[in-house]
Amino acid sequence: MKKTAMIAALLLVPLVMGFAGGGKAGEGAKKAERLRLATGGNTGTYYAYGSAFGQIVQNKTGIPVIIQSTGASKANIQLIQAGEVEIALVQNDVMDYAYRGVDLFNGEKITDFQTVAALYAEACQVVADPSKGITTIADLKGKNVSVGDAGSGVEFNANQILAGYGIGPNDFNRQNLSFGASADALRDGKIDAFFCVAGAPTTAVMDLAINKTVTLLEIDNAHADAIIAQYPFYTKLAIPGNSYRGNPNDVQTLVIKATLIASPKVDADTIYTLTKTLFDNKAEITAAHVKGAELEAGYAVSGISVPFHPGAEKYFKEIGALK
């Protein structure tokens, strides 16, 4: 069931009417009276990050931001298409699938959304129970492994990474659980490992590691390079040591980008102001959530295959990040 939480419900009409940022709204766009933000499960980074920046955006602009807990990237794109939310957090690879109508969106091409900004790196985290004899991803063959919600972007990431290690869909016992449910299942011995694609550290994994010994599995250079050659939306990144209890060393993995998208029906002024507010208030967002430290204009516009919303494009051109 989708959870909805209103953040500070009062709408200050003078502030909304006085939104900063020039430019005319695009055809069919209307002035936003609220922004409904689709995030992810309430133990994931999308929900925590979205709640943090949503509060700050509302405080600075006066427009209500309504945080929705959802099934994450695929569901969020569908929610924008259906007009049920105005903005959403999604993986940049899932955006690409939707816009081209491939893989996760095979036969279901969706182009009714636009990019606002890439925000931070999402790490493909493979969390395992070392007592089950698992020290590498190759050891997942024959194990009970949760690969995220069925049909989710996480499941596609898991399939791609496992295939890179020669593990096919029938070579392990597949479980489709959310991050929180996966952590509970590993704690209870019902699964041996799970995939979690989110900004690290992730709440579900942090909570699990408090009372359960877990190992974060590495994606070594040889396997990472081979996977990147096939799926160029990935890049390599090390998860810092001590992100989770009992894991003192840096662990290399693959990452994609958590990206903010918007409905083209939202006017350019609103999205301009949203984008500007995000980057003008990086310090406050970082104080509220550690991933805010990754807000950077050059990063925000790179590796993106879906056109930018006119409001976001205006902002990035003003600061020289886009030409």
Which residues make up each language-model segment?
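Short helix-loop capping/hinge motifs at secondary-structure junctions, enriched
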Residues: 130-137, 266-269, 322
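Hydrophobic/proline-rich hinge and linker segments of small-molecule sensing/allosteric domains
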Residues: 18, 114-135, 261-262
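Pocket-lining segment of extracytoplasmic ligand-binding domains
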Residues: 92-94, 102-104, 132, 168-260, ...
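An extracytoplasmic/periplasmic, membrane-proximal ligand-sensing/linker region
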Residues: 177, 181, 188, 198-216, ...
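A structural signal for short loop-to-beta-strand junctions that line the ligand-binding cleft
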Residues: 106-119, 124, 243-252
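Bilobed "Venus flytrap"/periplasmic-binding protein-like clamshell domains
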Residues: 32-60, 64-65, 122-188, 302, ...
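Short, low-complexity disordered leader/linker segments with a strong preference
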Residues: 1-34
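N-terminal (or domain-start) structured segment
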Residues: 27-97, 106
